Amino acid sequence: MPTAVEDKDAIHEVLAEYCFRLDDGRFVEMAALFTEDGTWDTAFGKATGRAAIAELASSLRQRGEQPRPRAVHLVTNIAITLDGDRASVRSNWMVMQSSPQGPRIGSGGACLDEMVRSGTSWRLRYRKIDRFIVP
């Protein structure tokens, strides 16, 4: 059985991979970080199930500014509460974007996550994204 430190480290890895996959436009791979019946609840829509999550993420990318500026999602202030094979996670996030004037904060906010252990890995069961820093 993993230690609490190992579980928290694994959860940090999931959150980092989420950002990398989202930034790279690998939405099917991003959705794979959720449970089969996971929910992605954003300011722009809510989706349940991996296919629906990937579809929503893709549609949001297409809807945004074109050509799309290079963006990097950052997650910080991660607080994890473990309860056996479940975890509650709070974090802050920010999107940094390139612009002709230089780097800028595109948006930011907070995430509330419910995660579950799935075999030997952790998955997002529910991710609520609050967006309160807007351009």
Feature roles, as predicted:
Residues 63-135:
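A beta-strand edge to alpha-helix "cap/lid" segment located at domain peripheries
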